[in-house]
Amino acid sequence: MRIVQRINHNAALCIDGDGREVIALGKGVGYPQGTDELAPAQISRTFYGVDARYLPLLNEIDPAVFEFSSQLADAARGLVSYELGANLAFTLADHIAFIIQRVQDNMAIRMPFAHDIRYSYPMEYKLGKLAIERMRELFGIPVPESEAAGIAMSIISSQVVPSSKAKSVSARRNDRVLDQCTRIVEQEMRVRIDRESFDFARFATHLQYLFERVSGDAAPLEGNEALVKSMREEYPRVFACAEDVGRAITTSYGGELAEDELLYLSLHINRLCEKVEAPGGGR
């Protein structure tokens, strides 16, 4: 296996013997003074077909979190009845790192979709619960059980849909509303969002969950009043933007967004804008 790009000391982008691009992980495989050829014994894990947008996560996420997420992705592939995308380990790692950050910041958020996920996707929810239990053991933090729904959603959203399948009317509407919501964020937060970036893909995935929840029959959850109040006061522009995005969603789909959902949406908007915010723009 030949190295074509060293990502960090323990990760490299390679070409295998069949000419396919692959990400190789292993202790020291990306060391600058190392060899350009890797032996199988040097490699602990490989990933084929991963979108290049996800590669920066290898430098941003704790290797222990990434390894845990990779194991969870392996378990999911063996248990669900549908094909999962090549990026799953990376999207799970990003989501789990965000959970850990929120727990460490004492920001416990009720997942707005938890009830629906638990009953509509029992296997994925079970995987989420097992992941929460293991995270408590591995990372020594009190992860709330409600986070199981978010992990389940990360698995569900990774489902591979045949490219030959024509877009339904609802899918086209989702695309239109997603574009509208993105333009609202760009205008109100005064940023330019790269629609080819991983950060945008993460934001778009969250909006898709909201579209499904609002257009369905499930009632929104309430709670987290203290956190909602804190977000309004500390990030007034972000929360106001979330409210406008929420109005765009409910105008298109009906229903309403609970304050819990606005809070979670605010966190995603803030996260999306962190790296691209214009100089001098406060949130």
Regions from the PLM with identified roles:
Residues 1-283:
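A cross-family "folded-core" feature that marks the main globular domain of proteins
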